[in-house]
Swiss-Prot record:
It is found in: Cytoplasm; Secreted. Interacts with ExsC. Gene3D superfamilies: 6.20.290.10. Pfam families: T3SS_ExsE. This is Type III secretion regulatory protein ExsE. The keyword Ion transport does not apply. Keywords: Cytoplasm, Secreted. InterPro entries: T3SS_ExsE (IPR040866), T3SS_Regulatory_Protein (IPR053763). The keyword Glycosyltransferase does not apply. One of its GO terms (cellular component) is extracellular region. GO terms for molecular function: protein-folding chaperone binding. Acts as a negative regulator of the type III secretion regulon (T3SS) expression. In the absence of inducing signals such as low Ca(2+) or host cell contact, the T3SS/injectisome is expressed at a low basal level and exists in a quiescent state due to ExsA sequestration by ExsD. ExsE binding to ExsC disrupts the complex between ExsC and ExsD, thereby allowing free ExsD to bind ExsA. Upon inducing signal, ExsE is secreted allowing ExsC to bind ExsD. In turn, ExsD cannot bind ExsA and prevent ExsA-mediated transcriptional activation of the type III secretion system. One of its GO terms (biological process) is negative regulation of protein secretion.
Length: 81
């Protein structure tokens, strides 16, 4: 089989945005345009800056995760009521 040409798949105009998850009470959808991805990442960065800035333990845990250390995730405990 020989491939003559390749072009990116264009999203259908009538296909509505499909929710793929939730974050902070909002549904998260796949962005059709690359610029929308950037604004979503920027929004997440702003949220992290606001909510983590005052807590040194959270900052340290996020830094360890950014450095590739998974112990903050492994060390989580489940609260029991």
């Amino acid at each position: 089989m020989k491939i003559e040409s390749i072009s990116p798949v264009q999203p259908s105009q009538d296909a509505g945005a499909e929710a793929v998850g939730h974050f902070e009470g909002r549904s998260v959808t796949r962005a059709a345009v690359r610029g929308e991805d950037r604004s979503s990442v920027a929004g997440l960065a702003r949220w992290l800056a606001r909510n983590v800035a005052g807590d040194p333990r959270s900052e340290q845990a996020l830094q360890r995760l950014a450095d590739g250390d998974g112990t903050p995730l492994e060390a989580r405990t489940v609260r029991r009521r």
